[in-house]
Swiss-Prot record:
Native organism: Acetivibrio thermocellus (strain ATCC 27405 / DSM 1237 / JCM 9322 / NBRC 103400 / NCIMB 10682 / NRRL B-4536 / VPI 7372)
Name of this protein: Elongation factor Tu
Subunit annotation: Monomer.
PROSITE patterns from the UniProt entry: G_TR_1, G_TR_2
GO molecular function: GTP binding; GTPase activity; translation elongation factor activity
G5: annotated span: 174-176
Chain residues that bind Mg(2+): T26
Chain positions covered by the region annotation G4: 136-139
Keyword line: Cytoplasm, Elongation factor, GTP-binding, Hydrolase, Magnesium, Metal-binding, Nucleotide-binding, Protein biosynthesis
Chain positions covered by the region annotation G2: 60-64
Domain of life the protein comes from: Bacteria
């Protein structure tokens, strides 16, 4: 098959497969590329190629993830699949690949298992907004009643973690049957569940709002003064657009944001009328002294982000092999929390009944920072000690 050129005109959606080990996540990923490949909408990627995922380093953490891309009539998809359970936990917490939706794979022969539960919980905590279920290995179960029982169990589990379990589409099929089939026509019966799944993903997972359409935010990386013109803050626009004359707030590292107006935008030494998500810019700030803005603050559309000091987070603690701590930590542990462009010291509160946290653990904890940081739910951070990363986290709930 000739390499189909992916048209970038279609809306783009990031998805991934989640679920218990050996329930068929990687087989399903391969089957999707095979079946869509018949329609010229994907390049078939074999199970072996997905399974030997390359290791990537994200914020100093090694994660194995496989990325495949494919398209349907309506959309372009980037799809992540992780070989190991620890890779999923790390991937979902660090947001190496932020998912707009996930395909939960459950083996019909086994029903929901411990990691099924953990992945649903993680999806809830780190803000994966939509789940579609693929009930795999249905060819191994002859009993229709058993299939219905497993479906009920899955729906109950989803409801437990505040997903709309009763509305979520569940598609029955067999990824292996699709992979092993020698049929070259996309109309073969064993390929229908895969096509049905993609149809449901298209329908059920909404197209995400693009970064450029969100309210403006730019983490400040550096600040300098231009004699006669004023103070310039530089950084990469995280989201939204900024036009000359826009009012912005300087948020974080102080209790209340400071308002100012952007009187000039510069990129590569040229003046711009406007900057968009992804641009590296310098913003000239009216009436702001050199000491009133610093690295670690965020320029943002007024009212869109607030400074906070106390939050709950999902945290993955690095193992010794990953360069993390060699010993556990306890309540009142005081590391640095690295948000966007700066470190702030914080105090850790462990959940009741948790004596200590070991390297390699995934834990929910509360953190009290000594200085406010521009923060919203879903924000990623690293935990550092003396400049080295010892953990990664995701703000799951702001307390104050």
């Amino acid at each position: 098959m000739s390499k189909a050129k992916f048209e970038r005109t279609k809306p783009h959606v990031n998805i991934g497969t989640i679920g218990h080990v050996d329930h068929g996540k990687t087989s399903l990923t391969a089957a999707i590329t095979k079946v869509l490949g018949f329609q010229g909408k994907a390049n078939y990627t074999s199970y072996e190629n997905i399974d030997k995922a390359p290791e990537e380093r994200e914020r100093g953490i090694t994660i194995s993830t496989s990325h495949v891309e494919y398209e349907t009539d309506n959309r372009h998809y980037a799809h992540v699949d992780c070989p190991g359970h620890a890779d999923y936990v790390k991937n979902m917490i660090t947001g190496a690949a932020q998912m707009d939706g996930a395909i939960l794979v459950v083996s019909a022969a086994d029903g929901p298992m411990p990691q099924t539960r953990e992945h649903i919980l993680l999806a809830r905590q780190v803000g994966v907004p939509y789940i579609v279920v693929f009930l795999n290995k249905c060819d191994m179960v002859d009993d229709e009643e058993l299939l219905e029982l497993v479906e009920m169990e899955i729906r109950e589990l989803l409801n437990t973690y505040e997903f709309p379990g009763d509305e979520i589409p569940i598609i029955r099929g067999s990824a292996l049957a699709a992979l092993e089939s020698t049929a070259t026509s996309v109309d073969a019966p064993e390929y229908q569940p895969i096509l049905k799944l993609m149809e449901e993903v298209d329908k059920y997972i909404p197209t995400p709002q693009r970064d450029i359409d969100k309210p403006f935010a730019m983490p400040v990386e550096d600040v300098f003064t231009i004699t006669g013109r004023g103070t310039v803050a530089t950084g990469r626009v995280e989201r939204g657009t900024l036009k000359m004359g826009d009012e912005v707030e300087i948020v974080g590292l102080s209790d209340s944001p400071k308002k100012t107006v952007v009187t000039g935008i510069e990129m590569f030494r040229k003046l711009l009328d406007q900057a968009v998500a992804g641009d590296n810019i310098g913003a000239l700030l009216r009436g702001i002294q050199r000491n009133e803005v610093e690295r670690g603050q965020v320029l943002a559309k007024p009212g869109s982000i607030k400074p906070h000091t106390y939050f709950e987070a999902q945290v993955y603690v690095l193992t010794k092999e990953e360069g993390g701590r060699h010993t556990p930590f306890f309540n009142n542990y005081r590391p640095q929390f690295y948000f966007r462009t700066t470190d702030v010291t914080g105090v850790v509160e462990l959940p009741q009944g948790t004596e200590m946290v070991m390297p390699g653990d995934h834990i929910t904890m509360k953190v009290k920072l000594i200085t406010p940081v521009a923060m919203e739910e879903g924000l990623k951070f690293a935990i550092r000690e003396g400049g080295r990363t010892v953990g990664a986290g995701n703000v799951s709930k702001i307390i104050e």
